[in-house]
Amino acid sequence: MNEPTRTYLESEKDTQDQIEELQATCIVKNAAGIHVRPAGVIVRLFDGEPCDVHFTYAGKTINAKSIMSILMLGAPQGGEILVTIRSKEAHRILQKIQDAFSSGFGEL
């Protein structure tokens, strides 16, 4: 995984609580790739979080709060997923998903 890139959205630069857009590439470590159980972990991780989150893999970008969308990515072991998070708490939320990828979503 790499360091996140940070973008302040132009229309929000002057607000006290800035909305950030952070991106980082995460590697799928699970032998079976992202299947139903890891997809469920991802969706639960984002449940209630004040963010927009997207995964990009193989040229497809999806809403990462949708289990069906995550499954349709078909990301295999070793797949590099670009994670994009837009939130006032983007750094904290990105760290949570990076930790989940690092642990193989609890399967390693």
UniProtKB/Swiss-Prot annotation:
NCBIfam families, alphabetized: PTS_HPr_family (TIGR01003)
Protein family (similarity comment): Belongs to the HPr family.
The keyword Chaperone belongs to this UniProt entry's keyword annotation: no
Top-rank lineage group of the source organism: Bacteria
Gene Ontology process terms (BP): phosphoenolpyruvate-dependent sugar phosphotransferase system
Active-site residue numbers: 35
Source species: Chlamydia pneumoniae (Chlamydophila pneumoniae)
Name of the protein: Phosphocarrier protein HPr
